[in-house]
């Protein structure tokens, strides 16, 4: 069965793996999922990204981060904002600050996928893909 929303699938796989305290999770690779994973790594939510497989069957293997003695997940919540049935676009001034700047909004812009901070710095708006905190 075809996956019609790979971004939601990615967020769900990461959310489920981190709730179960898994070290890694596998996600079907695409340009968009690679870009989102790079932003998550730059923002410190995941520790490592590697690829496994070849061609159409390529998967991203994400190493999740945990903190403290009790291994609390670094990612507390992931919410999909713009969905296939209802796209959400914001200009530079309308970009959201997640939890007053403690979280990250991942934005798809004309200059690529980036965090809300980077989009403000670049002076571009775009499609708000998800919130992570």
From Swiss-Prot:
GO BP field: translation
InterPro entries: Ribosomal_uS8, Ribosomal_uS8_CS, Ribosomal_uS8_sf
Keyword Lipoprotein (UniProt): no
Keyword RNA-binding: yes
PROSITE patterns to which the protein is assigned, alphabetical: RIBOSOMAL_S8
Family: Belongs to the universal ribosomal protein uS8 family.
Physiological role: One of the primary rRNA binding proteins, it binds directly to 16S rRNA central domain where it helps coordinate assembly of the platform of the 30S subunit.
Protein name as it appears in the record: Small ribosomal subunit protein uS8
Annotated source species: Parasynechococcus marenigrum (strain WH8102)
Organism classification: Bacteria, Bacillati, Cyanobacteriota, Cyanophyceae, Synechococcales
Primary gene name: rpsH
